Every structure is written in C-alpha cells, then in structure tokens.
Swiss-Prot record:
Claim: Membrane is one of the keywords in the record: no
GO cellular component: host cell mitochondrion
Function, in words: May play a minor role in antagonizing the type I IFN-mediated antiviral response. Additionally, NS1 may serve some inhibitory role in viral transcription and RNA replication.
Species for this entry: Murine pneumonia virus (strain 15) (MPV)
Coiled-coil ranges per UniProt: none
Keywords: Host cytoplasm, Host mitochondrion, Host-virus interaction, Inhibition of host innate immune response by virus, Interferon antiviral system evasion, Viral immunoevasion
Name of the protein: Non-structural protein 1
Principal place of residence: host cell
Annotated gene: 1C
Amino acid sequence: MGCNVMMELDYGGRAAWLAFHITNFDRSDLETILRGARVCNTWQDQRLSVYLVGRDCNLLRPFVQAAKFIHNTRRGQTLTHWFTKNIVFSSTGQETEPPIDPTCELLVELISG
C-alpha cells in the first residue's frame, strides 16, 4: 500500500527528478528529502513541483501540509544543485527516465519570484 511521489526541479532550462515510494509520510520526511539540497538566498528562475502518483487520500493530506510548511519556512529562498540531469532515482538505485503519466496530480508548485 502507499503511493509514489515525484519531485521536479526546473533550473536554467534543465529539469531534475526525484521519485520515491511512501507508505506513511509526515513533514519530517519531506524535510529530510530537501535537507540534501543546497539552499540559496536568492531566486534564480527556478521551480519546484511535487506530484502525487496514485490516489491514496490518507497520504495526500500530510504531504500537502508538509509541502506548505516547506514553502512557508523557505519563502524567498530556492534550491540549487539538487541533481544535474534528467533521471529518476528509484528505490533500487537504478537510473531511469522520468515517467510521463498524465494522471499525476500536482500537489504544490513553488515558483521563484
């Protein structure tokens, strides 16, 4: 049980992806994921998009709350040097192209000012 989450970071015309599977998700999980990203003090035309793949309503609410928490606490900052090419890091560690899934649901999008 659970669902898949995809995060996309667009920067300078390039896109980076992170995909992971969650069963029980809370704010600290998202904070842990974002902690590895380098945080800058200025916006540089970047966008962070978070997608939920699946329809597990029990997981949707805490993920949205976590994303809003990150947005509120990091307003005016942006993430850089997250990943350097278009890949998905699967649970097995294999690199694959990001999936094209029209049923993906956009949960939150943080756009630089």
